């Protein structure tokens, strides 16, 4: 939840309990954020976060450091055709920011059931947001159950998009530009493979 002062932060943490994740609103790369395990750390991070935020706002939530971090790259066109281009796993999980994490494709520690469950949710999320082009959907996943959270949806090309393109041979930037201009996935060919359309989901037999 969003708070604008240290007093509001302390009141919220009394409800949530420690540890908590604190993020400064409208910053990049985790600037001004951190994990608070006690009131001293809470004071320090909240004051710093509010100072770094363009809106003098910090977001506080339950810390999920032991949870897995899973990503899906999704491509969707104006006709509603939607494919999963790549599935990735942040090896160090939620405790390390995705920009500093080690990422592997495809995911190595989730079950087939978990893979398909999160894939379906990623496609539903892209559809609900009416994404036209490419997007990245990130999840936290409890390693001891199938509980999950949607962390964020990036409706743009990102660091993950570059990795996904390299790992799969699916030219995300080129095809996303074509889709945004009105082309549909079935009528676009993957110029890297030369034989598949953009509707073809890459399948990796390597890491």
Predicted features and spans:
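A conserved helix-loop-beta module that forms one wall/lid of the active-site cleft
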Residues: 1-33
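ATP-dependent carboxylate activation and anion-phosphoryl transfer catalytic cores
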Residues: 19, 29-31, 36-207
